[in-house]
């Protein structure tokens, strides 16, 4: 998955979450989704399947989906719970860890940091887990590939952003 695909997925879900707060409106969801199509973002196959199913909502009864159907579709295709604000954070951190594991598959020190992080994630401590992982990487001056580190651009936590900025300089 490319960085642009990750950012598109996060942007799309954040937009849907904002629409959810206004109350469920199929036509608005269809319009918003169609706007994403018009911008020609790079998407994953899974996100494209979601977009294809939702872009015509509000255009007629045959395209309509209930709130629950949309939530289920997104959960099944993307693994993101639209009503759960922590879901995007979880999604982003899990992608970062997956890519980091791939980048450092032979580095036992980094892999041990990742295992410690996974233990905290088990307890839903996403921000703390990521913060600890980034601090450990920074303390050991471990260079993280730019594309991998950029996955975290979507996280809006000041401490995480500071640690990420410090890791850019390693």
Residue ranges and their predicted role:
Residues 5, 28, 35, 73, ...:
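Generic short N-terminal amphipathic or hydrophobic helices
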Residues 25-67:
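Acidic, low-complexity, intrinsically disordered interaction modules
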């Amino acid at each position: 998955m490319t960085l642009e695909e990750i950012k598109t997925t996060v942007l799309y879900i954040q937009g849907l979450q904002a629409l959810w707060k206004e109350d469920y409106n199929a036509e608005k969801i269809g319009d918003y989704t169609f706007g994403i199509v018009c911008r020609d973002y790079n998407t994953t196959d899974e996100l494209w399947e979601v977009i294809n199913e939702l872009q015509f909502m509000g255009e007629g009864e045959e395209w309509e989906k209930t709130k629950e159907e949309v939530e289920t579709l997104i959960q099944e295709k993307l693994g993101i719970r639209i009503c759960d604000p922590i879901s995007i954070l979880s999604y982003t951190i899990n992608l970062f860890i997956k890519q980091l594991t791939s980048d450092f598959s032979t580095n036992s020190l980094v892999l041990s940091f990742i295992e410690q992080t996974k233990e905290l994630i088990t307890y839903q401590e996403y921000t703390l887990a990521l913060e600890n992982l980034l601090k450990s990487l920074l303390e050991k001056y471990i260079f993280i590939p730019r594309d991998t580190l950029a996955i975290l651009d979507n996280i809006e936590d000041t401490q995480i952003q500071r640690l990420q900025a410090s890791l850019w300089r390693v």
